[in-house]
């Protein structure tokens, strides 16, 4: 992630400098940006757990701008979103593709949003295998299991039938924010921040 901006606030004790991510965290905003891998997922999970410990009743905003990434890493974020007590509101800024779109759809019902020019894309899991035939079969079975799991969760989150999800995720399926709302992945397209 290159350059990280800092913000300066005046307090009773003088000026205080925060990196922008720490300052956002203070307002219960978590930013998921870039490819989802184990390192990124661990950081997101830690922030969600920290915010729950700070206030288990207050919503958390998860802002997503991601092309997707590793399925198991994304599922660790998904499980944590469901494990913690606060509602997690999801907001797509830019793009939510693959695992990014999956997590976008997993926000608390009624609290899944997108900015108007964002792009959302769902598809089936990607993977590859090499080695002995028995190893390839094991990996293939695991990918198919994950495909079934993710399709089932997407169907539950969107209100689409499992058959429709399977058909639509067979290839890359791109949507505008408006189309994602009609599909059921989000609840509202935001024009202005009302805070």
Curated annotation (Swiss-Prot):
Biological processes per GO annotation: protein quality control for misfolded or incompletely synthesized proteins
Gene3D superfamilies attached to this UniProt entry: 2-enoyl-CoA Hydratase, Chain A, domain 1
Reactions performed catalytically: Hydrolysis of proteins to small peptides in the presence of ATP and magnesium. alpha-casein is the usual test substrate. In the absence of ATP, only oligopeptides shorter than five residues are hydrolyzed (such as succinyl-Leu-Tyr-|-NHMec, and Leu-Tyr-Leu-|-Tyr-Trp, in which cleavage of the -Tyr-|-Leu- and -Tyr-|-Trp bonds also occurs)
A Pfam family annotated for this UniProt entry: CLP_protease
Keyword Cell wall biogenesis/degradation: no
Keyword entries, A-Z: Cytoplasm, Hydrolase, Protease, Serine protease
Family in the record: Belongs to the peptidase S14 family.
Function: Cleaves peptides in various proteins in a process that requires ATP hydrolysis. Has a chymotrypsin-like activity. Plays a major role in the degradation of misfolded proteins.
Identification of the protein by name: ATP-dependent Clp protease proteolytic subunit
Annotated source species: Helicobacter pylori (strain J99 / ATCC 700824)
The encoding gene: clpP
